[in-house]
């Protein structure tokens, strides 16, 4: 076992009654978690190379622990546990956001039904119950793709829905998640490793791994159909194909190729959705020693974040899903040097194909789909800044303009404005407030000398 399990073992000895979130609805003490792991390891000692068998055994105890063990067995130190709202188990009528349902022949014969969205509308699309057999035989739902995986025994159908993320519901009637890893894509087995059709921005802006070394890139792939995938595989050296379930399959497939490469790799996430924020925070509790880096930013095309489709407006222009690939480089665009800790540089994501936006918007991807100034903070989190002028450095620490704005908004109800000028933050008020001074003292004491309060007659854009 590697360091993730060792960390939990250490925590069990130090804080046996401390509770750890291993899923949104799954909370145990470190002592209980350690006991679960110890129990499972007895079964895993002889089968550690069979990921599917590992997870099948582990899921009987705990979905999240199953993932923890699967990643730990493969020597991935910076694992992150996905929330268990939908994955890996025989759960009926649950929300799912990975838009994949695996159906066995037995389920097919029993006329199993599923709940899925049936329209091409990404906003407020209807949810209906449909019989799987009818879908296969009549092809009555054109918005649903079915692929037959011929290499499995017994054979299984893999159902990919159009995927209104955060809204679709389905029945996961059979566990088969890790069978699709690192299988070559051919015309004969086109159902294997096919990525969900029309899913949300999550595959593009969701979990991304990066070595942060020598500008190495890792492909995050999301395609619409087998034709695109065939072209992609002919044109690029694909390290792995993954669904949009927080990169778990990417963790495993890449780590299997080079176990030593990912010993020191931070997990980079571009987050914004509530669930991702929850996941990030709770993963720190579960893995206190894990190094999690978070990217935040904004682009001309829309927010760099994961936003449920129900939150979008008709006139909102979102990036959508890349049809081919995006590569992520963590290095300065000007010097072309990799970023060191506490350095500021540029990050870019590039694509060679179209990006499909929601509400029928389409656009050719820019050479630089988004760019932003990048920097490390003292808490080991990586931030993507909209502009370099929006943050200031003092000593080894960085302070963002929006950090001040957020804290002031929480504790101050009157109108204010935060500006960055000449190496200082200026808080603009229309009248003096002792409350502002207290917030600065409590929240930004180490930056006090960089923060000044200015009183004006009226707050406006010309301040």
Protein language model features and the residues they cover:
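Conserved AMP-binding/adenylate-forming core of the ANL superfamily
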Residues: 17-48, 55, 59-61, 87-90, ...
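Conserved AMP-binding/adenylation subdomain of ANL enzymes
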Residues: 179-193, 200-240
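AMP-binding/adenylate-forming catalytic core of the ANL superfamily
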Residues: 56, 351, 367, 372-463
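Conserved pre-ATP/AMP-binding loop-to-beta segment of ANL
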Residues: 16-19, 120, 125-130, 134-160, ...
